[in-house]
Design a protein with these regions (language model features):
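Short helix-loop "hinge" at the ATP-lid/N-box region of the Bergerat-fold HATPase_c
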Residues: 48-49
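Acidic ATP/Mg2+-coordinating residue in the GHKL
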Residues: 70
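Short beta-strand/loop element within the Bergerat-fold HATPase_c
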Residues: 54-65
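Conserved glycine-rich
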Residues: 115-116
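Conserved micro-motifs of the catalytic ATP-binding
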Residues: 25, 29-33
Length: 142
């Protein structure tokens, strides 16, 4: 429901850019702070929309993680290691002057505080996948 809520919020951007959205395997429940998780997902989706000119975005849950995969311009390998640094704008962000270098930095900080892990894989010209992995909750019953 949280992902669908965010998609509704950004629906006009998908329509204006002619991008597709593919949601699947999202019928899961995770233990997290909804407000802060929303901030992370919105930031990642906003980046995907900003750097995807054609094709679309796929959002799915697999291996205890939420994955946002786009068909955008991708991130250079030399930039991948630094995307979570405060104030860092990769080559594409500097080229288009659309990046403050704070969004992914803040997303990483929030994810860390929530006990989640956020990672990025990307290929220039192929797109980017951002993954938010959730800690498996262990419940003890006395």
């Amino acid at each position: 429901d949280l992902v669908k809520e965010i998609i509704r919020k950004y629906a006009l951007f998908f329509i204006q850019k002619g991008l597709t959205i593919n949601l699947h395997d999202l019928d899961v429940k995770v233990v997290s702070d909804e407000k802060w998780l929303l901030v992370i997902i919105e930031q990642v989706l906003s980046n995907s929309l900003k750097y995807t000119k054609s094709g679309g975005i796929e959002i799915y849950f697999k291996d205890n993680g939420l994955h946002l995969k786009d068909s955008g311009i991708g991130i250079k390998n030399s930039d991948i290691l630094r995307v979570f640094e405060r104030g860092f704008s990769g080559y594409n962000g500097r080229l288009t002057q659309q990046s403050s270098g704070l969004g992914l930095y803040l997303s990483k900080k929030i994810a860390d505080q929530l006990g989640h892990d956020i990672s990025i894989s990307s290929q220039v010209g192929q797109g980017t996948t951002v993954s938010i992995h959730f800690q498996k909750q262990k419940l003890a019953i006395d």
